[in-house]
Amino acid sequence: MTTLDPSDIRILEAVQDDGRLTNQALADQVGMSTSPSWRKVRKLEEDGVIQGYRATLGRKAIGLGVLAFVRIKIDSHSEAEAEQFAAELMSLDEVITCYSIAGDADFLLQVVSHDLDTYADFAMSTLRRLPRIKEMQTTFVLKETKSFTGFPLKHARSVKTGA
C-alpha cells in the first residue's frame, strides 16, 4: 500500500491532462527533476494508479452518432452466471462501458452506434439474444453536455492505493 503524496497528485493531474508529456516536460510542470519524476510515474503505474495512456477520440467524428444507456435485468442472480453474462457483454465492441449495479436493474451499459437503425439491429440481433436477459430498457442521449475528461483529484491526497 502506498499513500499518494502532493507530488503524486501533481503528476496525476498533469498526465491525466496530457498523457503525451515527455518526462522532461512532466518534471518541469510538477517542479521535480527528471529522475524522481520518472521513478514516481513508474511506481504509480506499478501500483495501478496509472492504468494506461490513450488518445481521446471524438465519438461523432469517427461516425458514432448514437450514444445510449441500456439497463438490463437478468433472470438468474448466481455469481457464476452474472460473471458469465458480464464476460459476454465485454466481448461486444458496441458496449463501451459495463457496470454491475444495485437497484431495479442488474447491469448498466453504455453503448455507441453509427445511427438508430444500426443500434436497433445491434439491440435486437445481438443484445436481446444473449441468454438470461429478462428485461432491457434503452435510454438515448439527446445531447452530451459533459463528457468524461478525467477523475477529480482534489480528494485523492490521502487515498491509499495497492497493487
Task: Put a short name on every predicted segment.
Residues 1-163:
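A compositional/biophysical signature of low hydrophobicity enriched in polar/charged and small residues
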